[in-house]
Amino acid sequence: MTTLLISDLHLDEERPDIARAFLRFLKERASQAEALYILGDFFEAWIGDDAMTSFQRDIAAALREVAERGTRVFLMHGNRDFLVGHSFCRQAGCTLLRDPSRVILNGAPVLLMHGDTLCTRDIAYMRFRRRLRNPVSVWLLRHLPLSKRRQLARKWRDASRMQVRRKATEIVDVTPEEVPRIMAAHGVLTLIHGHTHRPAVHELQVDGRQARRIVLGDWNRQGWVLQVDGSGYHLTPFPID
């Protein structure tokens, strides 16, 4: 049994190379897996299921094809695509996951997250996130005119890129104390997340026990996938082209 986990593809029409790599990944690897987990920022931006482009519909159709072959597909919101809704998931044949979600991999409980809520030292972002992800705010955003939603998406994307460049490295990375706290709260010794674009496997202690935090990589010059199978956890890059 093989489970694949990816995140931070930031799919966008301006990066057809990443889209081609993802479609190839679905055909060559995901279609052979028992499950595929996509842990947020699947799309560079998402302004609502009612505004899907032909590019996004093609991605949904490709996911559905994999799901119909027997691979269970799970999707978690990221900070760029938190407006993805159930309509897209129905078209894509995938299940929308809560953040965080506790699942069983290789017979052991594992916590899955996008990862932005672990960056608690970024106080300005956390405050902005709480306002934006409030159910009332989400409802209002989904009911704004499409032109206004497109304008806001461009504004937030540009602001996010600027802030990442300006902020200190430790602020936009996870807060070290937050990791064991949330792992202990959910009773797990393995945490898997994306968001930071810093792929690595970190060893730590949780309540005096050996634990690990696996950070998925973003897809840019290369792609990243975490494969979980009978031999363990394997985080590996692969070429985009």
UniProtKB/Swiss-Prot annotation:
InterPro entries: Calcineurin-like_PHP_ApaH, LpxH-like, Metallo-depent_PP-like, UDP-diacylglucosamine_Hdrlase
Residue sites binding substrate per the record: N79, R80, D122, S160, K167, H195
Lipid biosynthesis recorded as keyword: yes
Co-factor(s): Mn(2+)
One Pfam family of this chain: Metallophos
Top-level taxon: Bacteria
Binding site for Mn(2+) 2: D41, N79, H114, H195
Sequence positions that bind Mn(2+) 1: D8, H10, D41, H197
Record's function text: Hydrolyzes the pyrophosphate bond of UDP-2,3-diacylglucosamine to yield 2,3-diacylglucosamine 1-phosphate (lipid X) and UMP by catalyzing the attack of water at the alpha-P atom. Involved in the biosynthesis of lipid A, a phosphorylated glycolipid that anchors the lipopolysaccharide to the outer membrane of the cell.
Protein name: UDP-2,3-diacylglucosamine hydrolase
Gene field: lpxH
